[in-house]
């Protein structure tokens, strides 16, 4: 399964292709995933993306929006929430991301009480520069593309 940030207008193409969508951050996106997954007779696994750090440059719902969207997602028969995703800001010292990862882990652990036992399994947080701290704080999915492929080249 590949992680992607999903725009509403791309749901139609993404749902048949992806096992797990990592970037669900709104009711609007949930509604579109539900509609397309229904047409494909599929239950689409998703991670709810929370912008714990409140960074304007990052997507994701606010911590305050999280309970409402989490509860709404639970009502959709063709959407299955599997966990949480968050991205910390880039810090020169990865330790500075630790408080953000702790909040995300607390939300993740709390989620487990709202869904069927065993349904919430994934905490996706941490990237090449801070994945070790993320793992220490409970991540079980990390994004380390830069470590594998090198820096992105923009043309």
PLM features per residue range, with description:
Residues 1-131, 135-137:
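Conserved alpha/beta-domain cores
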């Amino acid at each position: 399964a590949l992680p992607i940030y999903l725009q509403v207008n791309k749901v139609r193409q993404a749902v048949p292709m992806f096992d797990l969508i990592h970037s669900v951050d709104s009711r609007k996106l949930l509604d579109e995933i539900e509609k397309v997954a229904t047409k494909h007779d599929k239950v689409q696994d998703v991670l709810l993306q929370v912008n714990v750090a409140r960074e304007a440059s990052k997507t994701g719902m606010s911590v305050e929006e999280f309970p409402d969207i989490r509860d709404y997602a639970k009502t959709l028969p063709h959407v299955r929430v599997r966990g949480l995703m968050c991205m910390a800001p880039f810090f020169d010292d990865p330790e500075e991301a630790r408080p953000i990862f702790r909040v995300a882990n607390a939300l993740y652990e709390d989620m487990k009480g709202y869904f069927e036992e065993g349904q919430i399994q994934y905490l996706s947080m941490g990237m090449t520069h801070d994945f070790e701290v993320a793992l220490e704080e409970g991540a079980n999915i990390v994004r380390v593309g830069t470590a594998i492929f090198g820096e992105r080249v923009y043309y």
